[in-house]
From Swiss-Prot:
Coiled coil: none
Disulfide-bond pairs as recorded: C41-C115
Signal keyword on record: yes
Lineage of the species this protein comes from: Eukaryota, Metazoa, Chordata, Craniata, Vertebrata
Species per Swiss-Prot/TrEMBL record: Mus musculus
GO biological process: one example: adaptive immune response
Protein name: Immunoglobulin heavy variable 1-84
Keyword check for Signal: yes
An example Gene Ontology CC term for this record: immunoglobulin complex
Keyword tags: Adaptive immunity, Disulfide bond, Immunity, Immunoglobulin, Immunoglobulin domain, Signal
Amino acid sequence: MGWSWIFLFLLSGTAGVHCQIQLQQSGPELVKPGASVKISCKASGYTFTDYYINWVKQRPGQGLEWIGWIYPGSGNTKYNEKFKGKATLTVDTSSSTAYMQLSSLTSEDSAVYFCAR
């Protein structure tokens, strides 16, 4: 039996009208089932520690699912119960970057993932 793969596509967005505010995510990932992946979301144009970063999932043909948020100022997190044990949210304030690690990947994790302020 050949390998199967999981494709993760990453997008970012931000609320507000200030065009200088940006959230830049890492690129698409192709990973094996059972593996883990850590994706990044680098912020610029605002004070990183002052705003929550939310993570959202969208599977093909389905609606948006909120995964959780992290507050960079304190590192506090809140997760959707469905994603506890699946997603781990962290930040590196020195580089204004938020991270989401997804573990024990399955075909159900093949989706578009968004970070949003």
